[in-house]
């Protein structure tokens, strides 16, 4: 990912968001060439400081700034503080929209169509419970992500589609907030697969490959038929003194004590189990087995550390023989309860689209003049290839396809792939 100097955005510099979740002043190469996420002490903080001072952005914020600059360079108007209230439909075709700004109605005519790209609905508690089956809706995303696409496109007759959503795990550090006082939730993804760390259920048992999020998140939805309860939730991340001294945990730096309200600490595993209500014998047996795997470098239960993704994203290249395996051995021990969250912007439920990213109506025909892109579109394009960055990739792809079709030059790339792969 290239670096974007956000000072070129002019008045839009402060209006273009940065992320509270990633070190956006470093590229992936900067991070992984210096020991990865697990070795913050090796990062080039001089470069980081210079880029922060110059507001040079990398990763997702850099990509966002790049697109904003593209809009500026093309003299395309942008408006903040403007809420789209409804689409204007004429004889089944979307021809414009009605918005409000400062309490006044604004009507915009669409010459070639309207594109809805307002992300998902994770900050809408009602939608998250009904559509994503979230028990206690929490999310990492910004507070404004409330599902406007479902309302707008739904009123125009668009279908809503879904496949089962994936739950994420996360935690909240008291005092960390987003705008409007909304609690800032952090994903546990970068920390679960670190050495000297495991994730266990109430029986004290591991239930997944902690270094690969798909393994963990699908394990969360397993039901115990005898008790009619979740087998692996609630769950806790367990670490020892080595893990706490070596690695960060959200905004808590290596070696720092957890703030009040974050986790518990105990001199022994038995004491830790008692404090969090986990089966002590189960936890002791799990840790003993796991520590044995750390000696051989082979996790015989869940193959942790065998996937390049896990080794790269939450592994420590200094840890031998397996970058994701380090024993949970040294006192004191720590436990932090992990909470279910929506998919970090990657919800499955959304507006059904066709190969040109047109919204599809309940008659299974495209709604002319209405396009949907990114997380506003139903995520039915799922599979093993879907890894980190998929939301950005989908948004870019949808925008390209919608733009080509609206311009009267529809792309045939998807149909070529369908033919090539005999789908």
Tell me the role of every PLM-derived stretch.
Residues 1-103, 125, 173-174, 294-327:
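Conserved redox-cofactor binding core of oxidoreductases
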Residues 1-39, 150-154, 159-282:
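An anion/pyrophosphate-binding glycine-rich loop and adjacent beta-alpha core
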Residues 54-61, 73, 101-178, 224, ...:
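Glycine-rich loop(s) and the adjacent beta-strand/alpha-helix scaffold that form part
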Residues 86, 93, 282-380:
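A glycine-rich dinucleotide-binding beta-alpha-beta segment and adjacent secondary-structure elements
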Residues 106-111, 254-256, 342-416:
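C-terminal structured subdomain/cap of oxidoreductase catalytic cores
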Residues 122-127, 246-249, 379-382:
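Short acidic/His/Gly/Ser-rich catalytic and metal-binding motifs that mark active-site loops
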Residues 142, 186-191, 213, 227, ...:
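Short Gly/Pro-enriched turn/cap motifs at secondary-structure boundaries
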Residues 150-159, 276-279, 284-287, 393-416:
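Internal hydrophobic alpha-helix adjacent to the cofactor/substrate pocket in enzyme cavities
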């Amino acid at each position: 990912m290239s670096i974007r100097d956000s000072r070129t955005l002019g008045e839009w510099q402060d209006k273009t968001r940065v992320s509270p979740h990633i070190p956006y002043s470093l590229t992936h190469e900067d991070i992984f060439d210096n020991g990865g996420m697990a070795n913050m002490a090796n990062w080039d903080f001089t470069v980081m400081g210079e880029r922060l001072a110059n507001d040079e952005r990398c990763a997702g914020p850099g990509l966002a700034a790049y697109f904003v600059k593209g809009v500026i360079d093309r003299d395309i108007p942008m408006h903040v503080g403007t809420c789209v209230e409804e689409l204007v439909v004429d004889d089944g075709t979307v021809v414009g929209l009605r918005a409000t700004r400062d309490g006044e109605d604004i009507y915009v005519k669409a010459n070639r169509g309207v594109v809805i790209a307002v992300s998902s609905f994770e900050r809408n508690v009602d939608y998250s419970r009904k559509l994503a089956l979230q028990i206690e809706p929490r999310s990492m995303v910004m507070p404004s992500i409330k599902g406007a696409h479902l309302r707008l496109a739904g009123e125009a007759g668009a279908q809503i589609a879904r496949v089962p959503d994936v739950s994420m795990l996360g935690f909240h550090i008291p005092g960390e907030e987003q705008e409007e006082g909304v609690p800032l939730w952090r994903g546990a993804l970068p920390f679960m697969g670190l050495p000297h760390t495991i994730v266990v259920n109430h029986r004290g048992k591991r239930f997944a490959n902690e270094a690969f999020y798909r393994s963990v998140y699908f394990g969360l939805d397993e039901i115990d038929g005898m008790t009619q309860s979740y087998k692996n939730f609630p769950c806790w991340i367990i670490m020892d003194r080595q893990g706490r001294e070596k690695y960060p945990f959200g905004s808590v730096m290596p070696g720092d004590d957890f703030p009040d309200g974050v986790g518990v600490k105990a001199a022994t595993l038995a004491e830790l189990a008692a404090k969090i209500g986990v089966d002590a014998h189960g936890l002791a047996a799990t840790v003993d087995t796991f520590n044995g795997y750390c000696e051989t470098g082979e996790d015989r239960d869940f193959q942790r550390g065998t996937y390049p993704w896990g080794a790269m994203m939450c592994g420590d290249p200094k840890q031998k023989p397996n970058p994701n395996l380090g024993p949970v051995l040294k006192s004191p021990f720590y436990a932090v309860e992990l909470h279910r969250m929506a998919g970090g912007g990657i919800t499955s439920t959304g507006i059904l689209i066709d190969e040109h990213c047109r919204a599809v109506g309940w008659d299974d025909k495209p709604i002319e003049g209405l396009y949907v892109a990114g997380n506003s579109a139903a995520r039915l394009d799922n599979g093993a290839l879907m890894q980190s960055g998929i939301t950005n990739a989908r948004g870019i792809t949808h925008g390209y396809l919608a733009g080509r079709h609206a311009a009267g030059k529809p792309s045939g790339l998807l149909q070529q792939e369908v033919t090539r792969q005999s789908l």
